[in-house]
């Protein structure tokens, strides 16, 4: 079964532990982002891995190629399952990121590597005025997606609204990891291009990241099972 990735948007391990206790004995796919990683350091990954959960380490690296390569060598040694970079860092940076993961993983399996195209909080108007990008939002996402594939990465982070176009351009096996997923009853909050788990499945996402709809729910297990059901119909 293709499990949704739960965004552990907490500051402390105690909060994470309390949340994960709801799923005792179950192996989940979770996302550790900047807030949690920077507050706790690499030990947070070790503690979560001890509970047999798959980890997407969402740090969105974006720096000069050699710096990113060195960072990826270290991150690969943590035993995470997936990491990411910003595609805006360029093809060479992404290639160096992949090489770093291969070195860090050694004889083991390297983590999946995906690239952020445009954040789901970014509107087309904001992209064009603030980033001075004259293309449409879709054109920008497809450009970054193509660059990502050329660099030998496994896929991209994208809105579900662009997932089908990316599939047609880059192939079925190219990962399309979609944040901004909400149950129909939830507010969109700070993300603009949001969809439901069911719609994400229908329009071509390969993986979904769900945060508040599960982590802030009165009954996280019930909410998770609802997302799981919609995502795997």
From Swiss-Prot:
UniProt EC number: 4.1.1.23
Record: active site: 60 (proton donor)
One GO process term, biological-process aspect: 'de novo' UMP biosynthetic process
InterPro entries: Aldolase_TIM, OMPdecase, OMPdecase_AS, OMPdecase_bac, OMPdeCOase_dom, RibuloseP-bd_barrel
Keywords per UniProt: Decarboxylase, Lyase, Pyrimidine biosynthesis
Pathway(s) per entry: Pyrimidine metabolism; UMP biosynthesis via de novo pathway; UMP from orotate: step 2/2
Highest rank taxon of the organism: Bacteria
Record's catalysed reaction(s): orotidine 5'-phosphate + H(+) = UMP + CO2
UniProt keyword annotation of Lyase present: yes
Transmembrane segments: none
Keyword presence, Lyase: yes
Gene Ontology CC annotation, any one: cytosol
HAMAP family, A to Z: OMPdecase_type1_B
Function statement: Catalyzes the decarboxylation of orotidine 5'-monophosphate (OMP) to uridine 5'-monophosphate (UMP).
Protein name in UniProt: Orotidine 5'-phosphate decarboxylase
């Amino acid at each position: 079964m293709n499990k949704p990735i739960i965004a552990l948007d907490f500051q402390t391990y105690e909060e994470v532990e309390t949340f994960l206790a709801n799923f005792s004995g179950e192996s989940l796919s979770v996302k550790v982002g900047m807030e949690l990683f920077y507050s706790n350091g690499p030990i947070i990954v070790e503690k979560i891995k001890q509970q047999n959960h798959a980890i997407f380490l969402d740090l969105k690296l974006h720096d000069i190629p050699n710096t990113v390569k060195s960072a990826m060598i270290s991150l690969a040694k943590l035993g995470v399952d997936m990491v990411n970079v910003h595609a805006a860092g360029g093809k060479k940076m992404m290639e160096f990121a992949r090489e770093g993961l291969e070195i860090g993983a050694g004889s083991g399996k390297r983590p999946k590597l995906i690239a952020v195209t445009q954040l789901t909080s970014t509107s087309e108007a904001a992209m064009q005025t603030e980033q001075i990008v004259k293309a449409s939002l879709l054109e920008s996402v497809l450009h970054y997606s193509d660059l990502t594939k050329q660099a030998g990465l496994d896929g991209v982070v994208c809105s579900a609204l662009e997932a089908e176009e990316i599939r047609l351009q880059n192939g079925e096996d190219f990962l399309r990891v979609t944040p901004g997923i909400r149950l129909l009853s939830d507010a969109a909050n700070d993300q603009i291009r949001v969809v439901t788990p069911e719609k994400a499945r229908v329009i071509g996402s390969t993986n979904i990241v769900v945060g508040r709809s599960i982590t802030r729910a009165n009954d996280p297990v019930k909410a998770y099972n609802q997302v799981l059901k919609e995502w795997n119909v």
